[in-house]
Amino acid sequence: MDWRDQGILLAVRRHGETSAIIDTFTASHGRHAGVVRGGTSRRIAPILQPGAQLDLSWRARLEDHLGSFTVEPLRSRAAAAMSGRLALAGLNAVVSLLSFCLPEREAHPRLYKQSEQLLDLLGQDEIWPLAYLRWELALLDTLGFGLDLSSCAVTGNSDDLVYVSPRSGRAVSAGAAGEWAERLLPLPPCLRGEGPAPDPEIAQALRTTGHFLEHRVAPALGHAPLPQARGRLLDLISRLP
């Protein structure tokens, strides 16, 4: 069995004396792991940095085997990631969530493209937090937990939508919320794609998407805690001037 594809490096760990096992998110084969022979060598180790865009060739005797990769660099994002605290925290959050959320060997070409585009924006701090929010919404949608923010779950109207139901993921208007308002999640305008937004508003929106990651996605994956990297990114965005 063999194939060739492009992929984003999500994680790398040492394997034996000279090899490494890498976890990747590929365009056509989904999240896929494999061994890189000589992965700790001076030639290959610098290539294997989280977020790197790689040309991957995978081979295994049987399809369900771990298999091995040969890798060639296409694009390093190390310089962009090291350009500032937001870029580094953002990269770590993206690759950690992809590793955490995605099942192995299940293709998600649309999310792959969205992830590639988001990582290519690293270092552009003025637009990155909002781009990340939109990516997180796409991640929830891909996993089957997408939010329906088009109309009120109670009235069906699309006016004055200011809350999200923590159970259904649907929007709720101010008038329909009534005495339940305190139990609902905030729906800031940026969560509905309504133009640019200040960072505090984006942080508020990320607390809402975080509820569904924590209380819907994580339980579906066996109640594992969300990656700490996401929490660190949210804390950083919350403190941006």
Swiss-Prot record:
Keyword terms of this UniProt record: DNA damage, DNA recombination, DNA repair
Pfam families the UniProt entry points to: RecO_C, RecO_N
GO cellular component terms listed in the entry, alphabetical order: bacterial nucleoid
Origin organism lineage: Bacteria, Pseudomonadati, Pseudomonadota, Alphaproteobacteria, Rhodobacterales
Reported function: Involved in DNA repair and RecF pathway recombination.
UniProt protein name: DNA repair protein RecO
Gene: recO
GO biological process: DNA recombination; double-strand break repair
Protein family according to the UniProt entry: Belongs to the RecO family.
